Amino acid sequence: MKVDQTREAVTMKVAEKRRWKILLVAGATMALVAGMVSTVPSVYAGGTIMSDDEDKYISLGMGIRTSFTSGEDRSASGAQWDNTFAVDNARVYINGGIHKYVKFTFNTECFNCSVNGGGINGPPGGQFNGNSNMGLIDAIGKFEFTRTINFWVGRTLVPTERGELNGPFYHQVYDGFRTPFNQSDISGGFGRGGAGAFGRDNGVVFFGKVDPGGTHVLYALSVFTGLQSAAGFGPNQRSTLKYAGRLQWNLLADEQANNPGYYTAGGYYGDYGDVLALAVSGEYQNQGVGSFANPSPYKTFIADILYEKVLADKGVFTFNAEYKRYWTQSLAAYSDADCFCMFNGTSFTTYALYLFPQEIGIGRFQPYGRYTYINSVYQDGGGQDEYEGGLNYVISGFNARLSAYWRQDSGNAGPRNGAGFTSSLNAAGTGLTPSSKHSDAFVAALQLQY
C-alpha cells in the first residue's frame, strides 16, 4: 500500500503511455468542479486536477466491496442454507484543497446496496428495487494547521475505537464489524430519532499529535449532535450533545504519518515497519439512550491494540484486539415503543494474521483466525462466542484483495445488538430472550479501490 493511497482518496499515478486514462478521469472530475476555478487547471496525474497554485486541487477515487454468502438456516423457510451475492459497499471519494491549510472531503455510499430485494423475506420494492440508493456519507471541512492543532468540521467518523476508524475498507479482515455497534452505527439516520449513520455524525473534531521520547501520541476530542428525539417521543428531550475522544500511543512506527487525520487501519502489510499502538476511547451523551419514560445516559469505554511485526523472512505478523464496555438503557425501557435501545454489556474481539513473503501469481496469501465474545448484562443464558477462520489473497494492500472465510457463532442475530443478542423481553420481563440457534456461514469476497 502506497503512502498516498488512503480511504478518502486514491491518487492514481499514470504514465504518459496511459494518457487515455488521464483524459477519462479528468473529464469526469471536471464535470463536478466546472465553474469552481477561474482558469482551466492542468492535469498532472490521473484522478487529480491541479491549478497553477499547488495548494488548489481536486481528486477522485472510488471503491467497491462485493461478496457471496452461504448461511446456514437463513433461507426464507428458515430450514435451508441461504445463498446470496451482494454489493456491500460502493463509494465515490472526492477530495480537494482550497488553501495550504484548508481542504475538504465529499464521499458517497450506496446505502441500500446490501438490501436484497427490499429486505429480509420481503418482495422487491421501489427505490431501484430497494438496493441501489446513493447518498452522502462524508462532508468534511478540514482546517489542518500543524501537527498539534487541527479541526475537521461537518459529517465525519466519531473518534472511538480502531475498528470504527478503519471503516470497512481498511480492516485486515473483510467483515471487521462483529462486536456491538455504537450509537452512530445502529441508528441508521440523522435528524429526529436518529444518531448518525455508518459511524458518522455531524460535529467538530479537534485532533493532533505529539512525539514524547521518540514515541507518538495521537489525541482526538470531539462534540457531535448524537441522538435527537422528537417532542414527547424518545429519551433526549433536552437536546444534549454527544462527546467522544480517543488517545492513541504508538511506541514504534508513527502510523499516523501515513493516515488521513485521526483515521486508522487494521495493519499495514509491513509497509511501515514494526507497529505497536495502544489506545483508549469513549463516548458520552446524557439521555442518549432509552425512551421518553425511561431515559438513560449513553456511555462507552473502549481499549484497543495493534501490533505488526515484519519478520526476518519479510513475512508480516499482524495482531488486533479490542475490548468494549457499554452502559445504556435500563431493562424497563425495552418495553417502550419509543425506545432507542442498544446493547448493554461487554464485548471482546481479537484476530491474528500472517502474510507470507512469497508472491504467488499476482498476490500473497494471508491466513488468519478470529475470536469474538459478547456478553449482555440483561441476556438470559450468559455470553456467546463466535469463531472465524479465513484466507486473504492480497494483490495490492487494501486496494485489491480477495477473501474467503468460514464463521461459526452461537446465535444468528448479527452484530447490531451483539451477535446472537436480541432486544425482546422474556415472558417474566426479567431479561432478554437469547437467539441461541447455532449458525455457520461461508463467505467469499472482493475488495477494490482506485
Language model features: what each stretch is:
Residues W20-V33:
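Sec-dependent N-terminal signal peptides
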Residues M1-W20:
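N-terminal secretory signal peptides that target proteins for export/translocation
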Residues L32-S42:
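C-terminal segment of classical bacterial N-terminal signal peptides
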